[in-house]
């Protein structure tokens, strides 16, 4: 059904267009994609004629800084946190909307001699800033375009355009397959691009391994660093996990207030202890402790969210009030650590279906969801109910 990443790379190097699809549980969309370095008016015209979506230019942070491209909004509330900058036209264009002038703007965006003052704002080209680490950090079209450009040895920038059907509806996989056949275009998935990158590179480094006796039993503690940020993560491993059988795994995001201080606002501490105890009972398993405090927003922002909850907001509303998504956690680094440990098939200790989807998007297989429900307390009943109602957690309250 889909083409190999290597096939798409060969076409992109020749200046051709490919179709890139994301996960059905995400946007479930396909975009035309070409290398910005080889963009022509003809390619732009093809995209806007047959794609009908918005023409965007995924770039690295370096381009945005050099050209002084500020974020489009101060607080990004997009559900996928797409990092739009201000839209631009090159000063040499007139209206900036024609295929020729849009191609000119893109070409000048890549010109190393260009400066921020060389572009009018707003305009008709929409730059998007890709996250460092690409699809291993965020499985979006923005990151896919920059990754593909880099894999081609080209300037790290792409041109993308969503594909919309003639009736105005979004093109899904059956429509995209027909489109690819009609125009003889290679079609790939972001999932396959993730797998390709995972096969060829890694972002985590195993730094140190020790024996760690705990109140729950003795584990091997393995410390990891990563090349995306300064966060350090730790895996507690019990027994022989190299047999190829599904392994009991808990991916636990750091919660200082719950894990260390025993906060009753959440169930994190009891979940951590219960997971360690269950792994010890089974004699085999992994607890991966990820430094993603407050579902990824950090300790101080979590405390600010708690303050808003005291004023009547729930946990999701508090995050959004602070300008964050409900859940900012990233599973790419955790997935790489689990792969480094030799794991492929997981029995995942979780109540969160999104965690399952997040890990499976990185070439891991969750063979079983193992519930990890703790008794509710008066102080966290509302919090847990919100996780059920708004975050889709599987709890019996």
From Swiss-Prot:
Its cofactor is Mg(2+); Mn(2+); Zn(2+). The active site is at 327 (proton acceptor), 329 (nucleophile). Its EC number is 4.1.99.12, 3.5.4.25. Gene3D superfamilies: DHBP synthase, GTP cyclohydrolase II. GO terms for biological process: riboflavin biosynthetic process. InterPro entries: DHBP_synth_RibB-like_a/b_dom (IPR017945), DHBP_synthase_RibB (IPR000422), GTP_cyclohydro_II (IPR032677), RibA (IPR000926), RibA-like_sf (IPR036144), Riboflavin_synth_RibBA (IPR016299). GTP binds at residues 250-254, 271, 293-295, 315, 350, 355. Pathway: Cofactor biosynthesis; riboflavin biosynthesis; 2-hydroxy-3-oxobutyl phosphate from D-ribulose 5-phosphate: step 1/1; Cofactor biosynthesis; riboflavin biosynthesis; 5-amino-6-(D-ribitylamino)uracil from GTP: step 1/4. Residues 200-397 are annotated as: GTP cyclohydrolase II. Signal peptide: none annotated. Binds 2 divalent metal cations per subunit. Magnesium or manganese. Binds 1 zinc ion per subunit. The keyword Lyase applies. Pfam families: DHBP_synthase (PF00926), GTP_cyclohydro2 (PF00925). D-ribulose 5-phosphate binds at residues 26-27, 31, 138-142, 162. Zn(2+) binds at residues 255, 266, 268. The record marks 124, 162 as: Essential for DHBP synthase activity. GO terms for cellular component: cytosol. Coiled coil: none annotated. GO terms for molecular function: 3,4-dihydroxy-2-butanone-4-phosphate synthase activity; GTP binding; GTP cyclohydrolase II activity; magnesium ion binding; manganese ion binding; zinc ion binding. Mg(2+) 1 binds at residue 27. Catalyzes the conversion of D-ribulose 5-phosphate to formate and 3,4-dihydroxy-2-butanone 4-phosphate. PANTHER family: 3,4-DIHYDROXY-2-BUTANONE 4-PHOSPHATE SYNTHASE (PTHR21327:SF18), GTP CYCLOHYDROLASE II-RELATED (PTHR21327). In the N-terminal section; belongs to the DHBP synthase family. This is Riboflavin biosynthesis protein RibBA. It comes from Bacillus cereus (strain AH820).
């Amino acid at each position: 059904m889909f083409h190999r990443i290597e096939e798409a790379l060969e076409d992109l190097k020749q200046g051709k267009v490919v179709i890139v699809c994301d996960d059905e549980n995400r946007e479930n969309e396909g975009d035309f994609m070409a290398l910005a370095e080889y963009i022509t008016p003809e390619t732009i015209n093809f995209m806007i004629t047959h794609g009908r979506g918005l023409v965007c230019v995924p770039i690295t942070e370096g381009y945005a800084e050099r050209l002084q491209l500020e974020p489009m909004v101060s607080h990004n509330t997009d559900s996928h946190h797409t990092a739009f900058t201000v839209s631009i036209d090159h000063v040499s264009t007139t209206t900036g909307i024609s295929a020729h002038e849009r191609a000119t703007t893109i070409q000048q965006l890549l010109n190393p001699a260009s400066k921020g003052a060389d572009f009018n704002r707003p305009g008709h080209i929409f730059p998007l800033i890709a996250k460092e680490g690409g699809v291993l950090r965020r499985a979006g079209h923005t990151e896919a375009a920059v990754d593909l450009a880099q894999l081609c040895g080209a300037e790290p920038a792409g041109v993308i355009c969503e594909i919309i059907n003639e009736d105005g509806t979004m093109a899904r996989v059956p429509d995209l397959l027909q489109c690819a056949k009609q125009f003889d275009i290679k079609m790939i998935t972001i999932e396959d691009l993730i797998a390709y990158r995972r096969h060829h590179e890694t972002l985590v480094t195993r730094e140190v391994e020790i024996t760690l006796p705990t109140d729950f039993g003795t584990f091997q503690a393995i410390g990891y660093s990563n090349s995306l940020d300064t966060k350090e993560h730790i895996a507690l491993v019990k027994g022989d996990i190299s047999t190829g059988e599904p392994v009991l795994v808990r991916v636990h995001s750091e919660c200082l207030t719950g894990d260390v201080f025993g906060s009753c606002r959440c169930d994190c501490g009891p979940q951590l202890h219960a997971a360690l105890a269950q792994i010890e009972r089974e004699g085999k398993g992994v607890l991966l402790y990820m430094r993603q405090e407050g579902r990824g927003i950090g300790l101080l922002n979590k405390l600010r969210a708690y303050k808003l909850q005291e004023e009547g907001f729930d946990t999701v509303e508090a995050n959004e009030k602070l300008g964050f998504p409900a859940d900012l956690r990233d599973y790419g680094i955790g997935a790489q650590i689990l792969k480094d440990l030799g794991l492929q098939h997981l029995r995942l200790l979780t109540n969160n279906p999104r965690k399952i989807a997040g890990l499976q998007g990185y070439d891991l297989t969750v063979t079983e969801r193992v519930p990890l429900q703790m008794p509710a307390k008066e102080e966290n009943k509302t919090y847990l109910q919100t996780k059920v109602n708004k975050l889709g957690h599987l709890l019996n309250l």
